[in-house]
Amino acid sequence: MRVVVAGGGTAGHIEPALAVAEALRDKHGATVSALGTARGLETTLVPDRGFELHLIEPVPVPRKPNMDLLKLPFRVAKALGQARKALKDTDAQAVIGFGGYVSAPAYMAAKSLGLPFFVHEANARAGMANKLGVKLGGVGLNAVAGSGMEGDVVGIPIRAVLSGARDESAADRARDTWGLDKDRQTIFVTGGSQGSVSINKAVEQAVDQLVEAGFQVLHAVGKKNELPAAKPGYHPVPFIDDMQAAYTVADLIVCRSGAMTVAEVTAAGVPAIYVPLPHGNGEQALNAQAVIKAGAARQIDDADFTAQTLIDATLDILLHPSTHQSMSDAAKTSTAGNASTVIADMIAATIKSQHN
């Protein structure tokens, strides 16, 4: 059984692809390869997880008419040729895409080669590449209802290791790695792989009061941002590859509300303060609404996110054990069954039905 997954650029597109890839490999013995671009995180994440990566040209679709729009047909043609070659080289029997720059060429290549293909939309508002995939005949799979893309609701695929009981031995190892104090509650802050200027600024201004209140801060500032000086109770790092370890030590997470992030944080059972990215098609403002309504998280809009609003929300959660516990409980009960296995089973069944 040979499957190609397509999802590149950001972790939000790559992680669900890898979660399904692992389920296909581990449960069905499938040989799985990935499509990606040379400029995305997949260049490290995919090989690190044991999968072969095939690179194609990214095909970003301009949101406004400009010169890049005139180049789009040529970019699509080149990427389509590269995607077709990758599918032929791997002798793929099925394809699944997760949005992002590589998905549209993957869908078109699968269509042109007569391969079954699947389209997973993690966000509350579907992107253009995935809508195109379904229109081309792909099987639509939504994380939530009402995304604007046709298809069944299956949830978001996450790694199996992210769900389940907290591993205290793993937490101890993670604390040792980052120099964290076991006796202090930990606030984990991340703005994603590239970081967030607004989140970083507020955290750096708030950190002294947070530490004075008895907490410690693990702060992933982003690979391209200047690393602040560490000080007692404040542990800045450029980027964290092992998010599972960070979730394990976190008592509270402050982060953007990408669909994959929300799914992972919720599965980990950690209370969160979400700061939606105020760009794109507005999907981040919608992604966390279900868990917020369930009581598992709070939301502060980017325009309102300051040192003071961060301090106020953090103290309200961490200084009141009953509040913190109720949020954690709500997160655990909000987690649906892992979609990775469901999707892997669908792909495997489709391949088997075509070869019987």
From Swiss-Prot:
GO biological process, one term: peptidoglycan biosynthetic process
Alphabetical UniProt keywords: Cell cycle, Cell division, Cell membrane, Cell shape, Cell wall biogenesis/degradation, Glycosyltransferase, Membrane, Peptidoglycan synthesis, Transferase
The enzyme's E.C. designation: 2.4.1.227
Predominant localisation class: membrane
Xref: InterPro entries: GlcNAc_MurG, Glyco_trans_28_C, GlycoTrans_28_N
One Gene Ontology molecular-function label: undecaprenyldiphospho-muramoylpentapeptide beta-N-acetylglucosaminyltransferase activity
UniProt pathway annotation: Cell wall biogenesis; peptidoglycan biosynthesis
Catalytic reaction equation(s): di-trans,octa-cis-undecaprenyl diphospho-N-acetyl-alpha-D-muramoyl-L-alanyl-D-glutamyl-meso-2,6-diaminopimeloyl-D-alanyl-D-alanine + UDP-N-acetyl-alpha-D-glucosamine = di-trans,octa-cis-undecaprenyl diphospho-[N-acetyl-alpha-D-glucosaminyl-(1->4)]-N-acetyl-alpha-D-muramoyl-L-alanyl-D-glutamyl-meso-2,6-diaminopimeloyl-D-alanyl-D-alanine + UDP + H(+)
Entry-linked CDD domains: GT28_MurG (cd03785)
Residues that bind UDP-N-acetyl-alpha-D-glucosamine: 10-12, 123, 159, 193, 240, 284
Topological relation to the membrane, as annotated: Peripheral membrane protein
GO CC aspect terms: plasma membrane
Subcellular location: Cell membrane
Role this protein plays: Cell wall formation. Catalyzes the transfer of a GlcNAc subunit on undecaprenyl-pyrophosphoryl-MurNAc-pentapeptide (lipid intermediate I) to form undecaprenyl-pyrophosphoryl-MurNAc-(pentapeptide)GlcNAc (lipid intermediate II).
Family to which this protein belongs: Belongs to the glycosyltransferase 28 family. MurG subfamily.
UniProt protein name: UDP-N-acetylglucosamine--N-acetylmuramyl-(pentapeptide) pyrophosphoryl-undecaprenol N-acetylglucosamine transferase
Species of origin: Corynebacterium glutamicum (strain R)
